[in-house]
Amino acid sequence: MLQQVMTNPGEIIFREVPVPEVKDDQVLVKIMNIGICGSDIHVYHGKHPFTKYPVTQGHEVSGEIAKVGKDVTEFHEGQKVTIEPQVYCGQCYPCRHGKYNLCEELKVMGFQTTGTASEYFAVDASKVTPIPEDMSYEEGAMIEPLAVAVHGVKQVGDVKGLNIAVLGAGPIGNLVAQAAKGMGAAKVMITDVSDLRLDKAKECGIDACVNTMEKDFGEAMVEAFGPDKADVIYDCAGNNITMGQAIKYARKGSIIVLVAVFAGMATVDLAVANDHELDIKSTMMYRHDDYVDGIELVNEGKVHLRPLISKTFAFKDYLKAYQYIDDNRETTMKVIINVQEK
């Protein structure tokens, strides 16, 4: 079978390797689609701090079960699935308490261990989640980033009836806004400096879409929610400007959730956060229930994935996909690799 390998930053080869053997508790997945995310782009540019080369990528994935191990009873051949890419020890304190996304030895497929970018991939059945038969494989590859969003939204508990502001309308910000709305938020506002991204958010049903190059964030919150402003602000941009906006304009005693990963050291006014008794939370990846809840939101028509798909590339055009993203960064949301198209 064919397998993608990034040998060095910006260099991709394809090699023939044997189809993997399936252990008793595993399934063999015929890989259909793979999404490229911001972390993959960091690997492509040699800027991911926890990835060594060579590496086979692919952690946002959909596929079809081609074979099941003899001890696997919950899956069958031909079933549509997605894969949770976390590899965890199961022994550390977080793992023992159900928080394996915080494992002390956490590895992620496509970064610290072999990813799914091959025609077939053998994986523990426990890491496989079924997707509906009427869900496209492109959408199935986007369940992983949706799970990130769902997990982030859940960090504040139940969002029903809350007013939510989301900073950053890229793929994750868009999905956080959609997930919050789908999970019962009263009203959701999203901000960005890109009209294209804001138009995508509007297409996905977000209530208020604000370009902060044209309108002050604090003013926009009052306009959207009234003088009480937002109950929760999700920072999905991850820079000093957006975090500074969140701290400056958050209602006293409200919540800020850090969803985006900061590229460098954050320099924000924590004195204001302290004085205003702001509850600053963070979020890390997801767990199985976030996959299940995300799939349900899509199935119920509360989250729309297809508008986020910008372009699809054939498997052997993996490098062209990265080049396309670099050349069209301002107009690209999500690029998908079709593994079965060579």
Predicted regions span which residues?
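N-terminal glycine-rich cofactor-binding segment
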Residues: 3-21, 38-67, 82-83, 100-114
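Mid-domain Rossmann-like dinucleotide-binding core that forms the NAD(H)/NADP(H) cofactor-binding site
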Residues: 135-214
